[in-house]
Design a protein with these regions (language model features):
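Transmembrane alpha-helices and adjacent helix-loop boundaries
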Residues: 1-237
């Protein structure tokens, strides 16, 4: 018996609205998670290369701790484990304002921040040591040398691997469905449940993820070409 496709289920009833809401939530979740991951990655990646051992140790502990625990565990930890430890007023505020969304955002941010740290560290290690030595010789402190010279160059060198990590973050946002975040995968499952059309619903989700990923990769490829530094190639950390 041949399967009969009914693509109209994707825009009839509530399905179209669910898809758009899921797409919007995925974009918002990924964007906020990326901002947190980038900030943590830049700071901890730089800390792992500074001359001061305590800072290197602190950043290494963060990276190893968050990178080596599955993202799914962090989703559960921040959603189920942390709220009971908070004051009641804060806990009630969180659950009134989408605790599952913020738990998912934080889990994505700290997990991918640890992975982004390795990307930034690799970019810094790709910079000739003479760049740092010249900055210090001009009278800059270590902090100023990193802020004004080393980190800006490292960011440009790290664009290709950072793009890959950003795409991983986008795709990993689907894990948030396990804590009831109504992102794209959650909504495609909901459409499948209500319409009994798994192939159509999951195909729609697949195509949307593909369009998002290809779009981001295309934009970032142009950014990489624009900011490429001839003669310097980032190495993996």
């Amino acid at each position: 018996m041949r399967y009969e496709f009914h693509w109209e289920v994707l825009w009839s009833g509530q399905s179209g609205r669910w898809l758009l809401e899921g797409l919007a939530t995925t974009v918002e979740l990924s964007a906020l998670g990326w901002v947190l991951a980038a900030a943590l990655g830049i700071v901890s990646g730089a800390m792992r290369t500074v001359p001061w051992r305590p800072l290197r140790a602190l950043a290494t502990v963060y990276v190893e701790f968050f990178r080596n625990v599955p993202l799914l565990v962090w989703m559960f930890f921040w959603y189920f484990g942390v709220p009971p430890l908070l004051p009641e007023a804060i806990r009630e505020w969180l659950f009134r304002h989408g605790a599952e969304f913020w738990a998912g955002t934080f889990a994505l941010g700290v997990y991918h921040g640890a992975r982004m740290s390795e990307v930034i560290r690799g970019g810094i290690q790709a910079i000739p040591k003479t760049q740092f030595e010249a900055a210090v010789a001009m009278g800059l402190t270590t902090f100023q040398a990193y802020r004004l010279v080393i980190v800006p160059i490292a960011l440009r060198l790290s664009l290709p691997p950072a793009t890959n990590e950003s795409l991983n973050l986008l795709k990993n946002s689907s894990v948030a469905l396990t804590i009831s975040v109504a992102e794209l995968t959650f909504q495609t499952r909901q459409i499948e449940t209500y319409t009994a059309r798994a192939i159509e619903a999951l195909t729609a989700g697949t195509v949307i993820y593909l369009v998002l990923s290809v779009g981001i990769a295309t934009i970032m490829a142009r950014v990489e070409d624009r900011f490429a530094i001839p003669g310097l190639i980032a190495r993996g950390g």
